[in-house]
């Protein structure tokens, strides 16, 4: 069972666990201390209970509630409404019994926090931080729960839940730093995101004012948490840079409980660390101000390749050829996220490409289509109808927001996913076609008997402005050479035991990730979409920035009040 695998994770944390008080220890805070904390945060301390508790015999059992839970079990909006709702992976130590995953004989919190503070003010964050430090208990930070590495979870911990800390969204026509003492190198428009808003909120707010912001593909992901602090990519990052490149200012609660503003003028080292060095470890960001840009027309191409029965080779080979062409279309301004996997036993490649147009003149649109046809679609046509079916559709939208609203972006919560990824530079894509084809086959077919399914994600979100290092950023330097972020996602079988789980994980790390590294040596990956068991995680996730980031961590959090799995400062 997957819970047994989580126990392996807990064992890996054992050295740290001995340093923090847990509910089994005499040093665990007394009921009176928890009551006092609850009073200080105005009754917003939550004793966490498993999401599906209503499905199990005992107090709280409800057949109707259980039915509702099962119906919403993979709905990301529903998941985010709980202080212990996690999208990747779903907490499966207490699944709804009538959901499409096997029931377990007991219902437990597992790795979820014991208590959560439903923070609505920065003062609540400061209170929770100081309480955790004073009582030597583990502290975790959670917004919406999109974290495949489980960094917002922690056994026996106190969680600060930021989803309901929402002080508003504010547009600045001409930005200047809070203290105005230095030049921020940006006097254009900006938006301050005050707390636990999601990208859909920010996109809607910006669109009503004729603007766009660089954010994530999934509208349910939180704006100012690990996504932004770890780099952040999306359909507009090629045009304007990574999401973290857009940050002009952070409001941060430090490990001491102090509430400060970090920007290019003050707390500059902390500001830099929070622009790419990962979330959950330097302080708690409660507000961020990011750049905005005028919206423009958007050209959209929907490309689908559907394999014929009993022919897997053709789609895999065609996918490899297309990947080798990505740098050419990236340099013409195209972006997008493609997926390839099996649907009803047939290989399907689905690629939504977009181009953020400077104008919607017929000349601009014709040129963009010519590039896509020349580099991608014409390459596929010889096999159309004999090896696979190709479908290509074009659509022009008046604005980026209109395109975003017309195309599905929300992904369901996934049970027991495992991910590995790698950033690829131009040379590794265009000059090693044979190796690239071999890689696609390894990722798609190796170890398939160990998983219940898998798919490959090709994120064309780099190149362009991403290649330009923005001042005061600490993102993995590999991003500044990257044209593609390639991800492999494998799903454990629902009934996988600990032995099967270990085999699947080992295959992902030692075979699939290793093959990616071999094709793109000297690169790295995106900290938020990486293999949690990569033995070279410091180098692969942070590159040459790690040692400097660690020095910032030690400066602002010498007692490790903030500690999370595979975060800077996690030396276990």
Please give the residue ranges for each predicted region:
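Soluble FAD-dependent oxygen oxidases
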Residues: 16-572
């Amino acid at each position: 069972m997957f819970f047994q695998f989580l126990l392996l994770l807990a064992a890996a944390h054992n050295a740290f666990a001995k340093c923090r008080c847990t509910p089994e220890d005499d040093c665990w805070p007394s009921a009176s201390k928890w009551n006092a904390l609850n009073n200080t945060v105005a009754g917003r301390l939550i004793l966490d209970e498993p999401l599906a508790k209503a499905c199990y015999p005992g107090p709280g059992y409800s057949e109707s509630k259980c039915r509702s839970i099962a119906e919403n079990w993979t709905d990301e909006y529903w998941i985010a409404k709980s202080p212990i709702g996690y999208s990747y992976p779903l907490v499966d130590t207490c699944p709804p019994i009538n959901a499409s995953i096997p029931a377990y004989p007991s219902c437990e919190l597992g790795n979820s926090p014991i208590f959560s503070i439903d923070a609505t003010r920065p003062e609540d964050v400061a209170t929770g931080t100081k309480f955790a430090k004073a009582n030597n208990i583990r502290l975790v930070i959670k917004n919406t729960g999109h974290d495949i590495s489980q960094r917002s979870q922690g056994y026996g911990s106190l969680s600060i839940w930021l989803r309901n800390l929402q002080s508003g969204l504010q547009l600045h026509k001409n930005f200047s730093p809070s203290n105005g003492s230095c030049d921020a190198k940006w006097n254009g428009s900006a938006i301050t995101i005050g707390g636990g808003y999601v990208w859909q909120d920010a996109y809607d707010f910006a669109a009503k004012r004729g603007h766009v912001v660089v954010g994530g593909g999934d509208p349910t992901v939180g704006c100012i948490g690990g996504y932004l602090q770890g780099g952040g990519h999306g359909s507009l990052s090629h045009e304007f840079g990574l999401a973290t490149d857009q940050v002009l200012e952070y409001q941060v609660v430090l490990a001491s409980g102090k509430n400060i503003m970090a920007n290019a003028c003050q707390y500059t080292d902390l500001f830099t660390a929070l622009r790419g060095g990962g979330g959950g470890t330097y302080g708690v960001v409660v507000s961020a101000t990011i750049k905005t840009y005028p919206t423009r027309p958007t050209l959209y191409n929907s490309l689908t390749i559907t394999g014929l029965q009993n022919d897997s080779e053709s789609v895999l080979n065609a996918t490899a050829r297309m990947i080798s062409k990505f740098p050419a279309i990236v340099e013409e301004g195209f972006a997008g996220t493609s997926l390839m996997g099996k649907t009803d036993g047939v290989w399907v490649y689905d690629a939504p490409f977009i181009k953020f147009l400077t104008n919607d003149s017929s000349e601009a649109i014709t040129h963009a289509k010519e590039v896509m046809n020349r580099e991608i679609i014409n390459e596929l046509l010889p096999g159309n109808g004999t090896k696979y079916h190709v479908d290509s559709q074009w659509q022009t939208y008046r604005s980026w927001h209109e395109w975003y609203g017309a195309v599905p972006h929300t992904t369901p919560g996934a049970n027991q996913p495992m991910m590995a990824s790698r950033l690829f530079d131009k040379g590794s894509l265009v000059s090693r076609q044979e190796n690239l084809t071999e890689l696609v086959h390894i990722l798609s077919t190796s170890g398939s008997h160990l998983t219940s399914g898998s798919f490959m994600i090709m994120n064309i979100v780099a190149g362009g402005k991403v290649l330009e290092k923005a001042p005061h950023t600490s993102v993995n330097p590999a991003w500044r050479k990257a044209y593609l972020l390639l991800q492999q996602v494998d799903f454990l079988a629902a009934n996988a035991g600990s032995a099967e789980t270990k085999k699947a994980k080992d295959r992902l790390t030692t075979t699939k990730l290793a093959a990616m590294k071999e094709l793109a040596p000297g690169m790295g990956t995106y900290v938020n979409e990486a293999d949690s068991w990569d033995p070279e995680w410091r180098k692969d996730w942070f590159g040459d920035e790690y040692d400097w980031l660690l020095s910032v961590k030690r400066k602002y959090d010498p007692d490790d009040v903030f500690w999370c799995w595979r975060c800077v400062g996690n030396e276990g």
